[in-house]
A protein has these predicted regions:
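ASCE P-loop NTPase motor core, strongest for the SF2 helicase catalytic module
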Residues: 1-162
Length: 162
């Protein structure tokens, strides 16, 4: 459906073995694809092909190799095939499409199965995000720090009480 509508898709997985399974299926169906893992020799070439080709395609990326420093604005869909324990890594993956020059609305999907390990990881991610918001948010811990508190934190160990 997405291909027929002219959409390009990024598929992220933390497991290269899962990307291989998806790649084999897409190749069996003669679907255009690009592939990027830590073992990819021509990273720039794969990215350029995906960005410039007119034919809608799928870009399979490992979370670690494709999660940072890439600009993939020709995609309009992002699929996170399996969750990563650190929500920032997933956010970085989704952000590959949210760059200057993005002309499409971007839709991100996280694939989860009810009552699975992945669902529990997603719950832990949510708790981790809440903790960060509670500590660093507008009404969190850091907003109530005064100059004396900051001096204590930054200079701790310099005093004689040590």
């Amino acid at each position: 459906e997405l291909r027929a509508a002219g959409h390009k898709v990024l598929v992220f997985s933390q497991f290269v073995s899962m990307l291989e399974i998806i790649k084999n299926r897409l190749e069996a169906e003669n679907r255009p694809l690009n592939y990027l893992t830590g073992q990819t020799k021509d990273r720039r070439g794969e990215i350029e092909k995906f960005q410039t080709t007119k034919d809608p395609s799928v870009f399979l990326l490992s979370l670690k190799a494709g999660g940072a420093g890439l600009n993939l604005t020709s995609a309009s869909y992002v699929v996170l095939y399996d969750p990563w324990w650190n929500p920032a890594v997933e956010s970085q993956a989704i952000d590959r499409t949210h760059r200057i020059g993005q002309k499409n609305k971007v839709i991100a999907y996280r694939l989860l199965t009810k009552d699975s390990v992945e669902e529990k990881i997603r719950i832990l991610q949510h708790q981790k995000n809440q903790l960060v918001a509670n500590v660093l948010g507008d009404e969190g811990f850091t907003s109530s720090l005064g100059i004396d508190d900051l001096n204590f934190i930054l200079n701790h160990g310099d005093d004689e009480e040590g």
